[in-house]
Regions:
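Low-complexity, glycine/proline-biased repetitive segments and flexible coils/loops
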Residues: 2-291
Length: 291
């Protein structure tokens, strides 16, 4: 019986892997998915690591109203959750879903739209929250409004995937919104009319970005899943490294960078807030397994 088991195992041969865009370094192969797909493994089971990044939330849209009098500043979008997988074993067809970013908001006072989840087989990264729209992979930034002197805290991030958004701030004459959380840091809270910056994304997988050409390259370091910036009656704030975009007061905010999971920046009176960035899945495995 043991001899038969050895023979059966040897007939499987080394894993044969398909799917995604293939790149490599001296030690590893990387398969990158920027859209839904399948990681195919035939032969022996494959041992792999992976990062799964969900779609980021869009920034909120503000409004100034004369009757009744209010000035709403909604927050920056939270980054999509970044789920890291290590020493996984897989065979057959493993389904991959790459989440979309939340849609931009246009006109009126509106919280940002949540992104959508990304997944690899049964492993799911949680979508980023829209600005002032609560919890997510990373939380959205909080709201500030005057003359009501009302503000909200930032949304909570998902443990192990992201961070909290920053709080909004308000008095009877100023208001500002918080930055969305990022995979590497919490969003900054707003202070006295100044919007909070989006939280920084994660640079833990910078070497993966260098090989695959993904993430945001900042002076040679690659970041994923940065939060969107907030706005304020005095000033707006920057987005976080990792595809998050800045908040703006009187113009349209830019969309977060595609396939980073970044959060979109908020706007006060521009035509649209920044849409969230779509997600990403990268699978890495050793060359010695397959060559």
């Amino acid at each position: 019986m043991p001899i038969l088991g050895i023979l059966a195992s040897s007939k499987l041969g080394k894993p044969v892997v398909t799917g995604g865009t293939l790149t490599s370094d001296a030690t590893y192969y990387y398969r990158t998915f920027t859209a839904n797909g399948t990681l195919g493994v035939t032969g022996s089971a494959l041992t792999y690591d992976a990062i799964v990044i969900a779609g980021g939330g869009s920034g909120g849209h503000g409004e100034a109203s004369a009757s009744p009098v209010f000035n709403d500043y909604n927050g920056g979008g939270g980054a999509g959750g970044l789920l890291a997988l290590t020493s996984q074993s897989g065979s057959g067809n493993l389904s991959i879903v790459v989440g979309a970013g939340g849609a931009a908001r246009t006109g009126g006072s509106a919280v940002g739209a949540n992104g959508t989840n990304s997944s690899l087989a049964a492993n799911t990264a949680t979508a980023g929250a829209g600005g002032s729209n609560g919890a997510g992979g990373s939380g959205g930034g909080g709201l500030g409004t005057y003359p009501d002197n009302f503000s909200t805290s930032g949304g909570a991030g998902t443990a192990g995937q992201g961070n909290n958004g920053g709080a909004g701030a308000a008095t009877t004459s100023t208001a500002s919104s918080g930055g969305g959380g990022g995979a590497g840091a919490v969003g900054s809270s707003a202070v006295t009319g100044n919007g909070g910056a989006g939280g920084a994304g994660s640079s833990t997988y910078s070497s993966w970005g260098s090989v695959t050409g993904t993430g945001q390259n900042v002076s040679g370091t690659y970041y994923y899943a940065g939060g969107g910036g907030g706005t304020g009656s005095s000033s707006a704030a920057a987005g976080g490294n990792g595809g998050g975009t800045a908040g703006v007061n009187t113009s349209s905010a830019s969309s977060a960078t595609a396939n980073t999971g970044g959060g979109g920046g908020s706007t006060f009176s521009g035509s649209s807030s920044g849409a969230g960035g779509s997600g990403l899945v990268i699978v890495r495995y050793t060359k010695v397994q397959v060559d």
